[in-house]
Amino acid sequence: MSWQAYVDDHLMCDIEGHEGHRLTAAAIVGHDGSVWAQSATFPQFKPEEMNGIMTDFNEPGHLAPTGLHLGGTKYMVIQGEAGAVIRGKKGSGGITIKKTGQALVFGIYEEPVTPGQCNMVVERLGDYLIEQGL
C-alpha cells in the first residue's frame, strides 16, 4: 500500500459511526522532515517547526512554553504521552502527532470532530505502523 493510501484511507476517512466527520488535514512525515504523504489540505510547514516537534519527542515539555507551530499556526500543547504523542489545541480544533519508529503521523481537526476522535484515528494508524516496524 502506498503512503498516500494510508493518508487517504486511514486518516482522511469518515470517523467510525460519524458519517461525514473527518479530519481536516493529515500527513505522514519522516523523522527528517521529508513528507511521505499528505492530504491536499495539510499546511506547508517550515523545517524549524518540524525540528521543534522532533525535539519535543526527545525532550518532552520543550514546546510547552512556546506552543507547537505548524504551517504558521500556533497550537497550545496539551497533555500527551511523553516521547510518543503530542497533542495541541487551537480554538475549536487541534492537532495530534504520533511518533513511530521512522515517521510522524499528523492529524488536524476542527469541530464537530472531537479531540478524542482525532487521537483515535491518528494513534490507531501510528500503532499499526509501529507493529509493522515502521
Curated annotation (Swiss-Prot):
The keyword Disulfide bond applies. A motif (Involved in PIP2 interaction) lies at residues 84-100. GO terms for cellular component: cell cortex; cytoskeleton. The keyword Cytoplasm applies. InterPro entries: PFN, PFN_euk, PFN_sf, Profilin_CS. PROSITE patterns: PROFILIN. Pfam families: Profilin (PF00235). Keywords: Actin-binding, Allergen, Cytoplasm, Cytoskeleton, Disulfide bond, Phosphoprotein. Phosphorylated by MAP kinases. GO terms for molecular function: actin monomer binding. The modification Phosphothreonine is found at T114. SUPFAM superfamilies: Profilin (actin-binding protein). Disulfide bonds join C13-C118. It is found in: Cytoplasm, Cytoskeleton. Binds to actin and affects the structure of the cytoskeleton. At high concentrations, profilin prevents the polymerization of actin, whereas it enhances it at low concentrations. Belongs to the profilin family. The variability of the residues taking part of IgE-binding epitopes might be responsible of the difference in cross-reactivity among olive pollen cultivars, and between distantly related pollen species, leading to a variable range of allergy reactions among atopic patients. Occurs in many kinds of cells as a complex with monomeric actin in a 1:1 ratio. This is Profilin-2. It comes from Olea europaea (Common olive).
